[in-house]
């Protein structure tokens, strides 16, 4: 139903979720020649760039980020900022059932967002395959970033900035 309303241009449809990037590369396996040893340096702890993104089917993406864990307060602040951006049609934000999306501070804002034609729609439990922004996060982690991008924190941040900017998705506040 929501896709039909979007297709008929009655609404703007956004898929939203968070992801985290740190200095541990996402290497599911590694090949090596016989009798040679591959070394992958493990890092413990360290910094993490947490992002909350809202991606439309029209190709628009807004990303909010911070280096401390994402909580309900951050989701609320991000959605409040997003609700102030001009939009000619009602917006529907599709979210999964993560605890931060159901935080009381988020629920307290629902009426305010509804007054500016922004509604939240929660996906069924255990259905990340229905949240299209998950594909973007997967491409970032497994396709666009490679081993050299994880050498330092500044290199990883710079690379993420390039990845999102080159896709037309600069990092926001």
Each predicted region: which residue ranges?
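Short functional hotspots at interaction and active-site rims
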Residues: 1-173
């Amino acid at each position: 139903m929501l896709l039909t309303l979007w297709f008929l241009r009655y609404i703007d449809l956004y898929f939203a979720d968070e992801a985290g990037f740190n200095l541990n590369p996402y290497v599911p396996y590694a090949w090596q020649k016989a009798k040679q040893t591959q070394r992958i340096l493990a890092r413990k702890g360290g910094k993490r760039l947490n992002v909350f993104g809202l991606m439309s089917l029209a190709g628009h993406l807004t990303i909010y980020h911070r280096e401390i864990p994402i909580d309900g307060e951050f989701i609320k602040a991000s959605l409040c900022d997003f609700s102030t951006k001009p939009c000619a049609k009602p917006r529907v934000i599709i979210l999964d059932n993560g605890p931060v999306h159901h935080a009381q501070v988020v629920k307290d804002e629902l009426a305010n967002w509804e007054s500016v034609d922004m509604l939240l729609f929660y996906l069924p439990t255990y259905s990340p395959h229905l949240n299209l922004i998950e594909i973007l996060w997967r491409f970032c982690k497994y396709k666009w970033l490679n081993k050299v991008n994880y050498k330092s924190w500044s290199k990883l941040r710079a690379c993420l900035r390039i990845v999102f900017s080159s896709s037309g998705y600069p990092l926001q506040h």
